[in-house]
């Protein structure tokens, strides 16, 4: 059971299979489907995803973090048809690792506020 000030942070880290890169239509379609989950799946409370910006041996190619208010929301997301569509797309082109952690919403607010100050040049 989550405390009132907690969210589940669902993190996924994708690594392309051999022969796949961002020049692949399959990769770009999987990316677009994943970016659109926030518009299709109401259980998602927050959603951030994108390509890796550096090329290092230990880097992944794409990652996401989704925020959920409850384990039942996370469970509903997992079986949602739009999520399953994305799973099938990524399965064809990548392997991935998942981590679900609890995050304190006060900590999240502090991170967002700090980012706002940086963006304002303070």
Model-derived features: positions:
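Conserved catalytic core of Hanks-type protein kinase domains
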Residues: 67-68, 92
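Short S/T/G/P-rich N-terminal loop/turn motif that feeds into the first structured element of a domain
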Residues: 1-61, 69-76, 99-122
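Residues that scaffold the ATP/ADP-binding catalytic core of kinase and kinase-like folds
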Residues: 77, 86
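Structural motif
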Residues: 42-45, 81, 94
């Amino acid at each position: 059971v989550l405390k009132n000030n907690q969210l589940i942070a669902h993190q996924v880290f994708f690594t392309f299979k051999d022969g796949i890169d961002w020049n692949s239509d399959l990769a770009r379609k999987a990316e677009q489907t994943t970016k659109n989950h926030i518009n299709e799946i109401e259980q998602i409370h927050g959603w951030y995803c994108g390509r890796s910006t550096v090329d290092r041996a230990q880097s992944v190619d794409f990652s996401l973090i989704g925020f959920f208010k409850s384990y039942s929301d996370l469970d509903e997301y997992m079986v949602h048809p739009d999520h399953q569509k994305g799973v099938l797309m990524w399965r064809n082109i990548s392997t991935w690792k998942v981590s679900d952690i609890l995050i304190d919403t006060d900590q999240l607010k502090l991170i967002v506020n700090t980012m706002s100050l940086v963006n304002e040049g303070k």
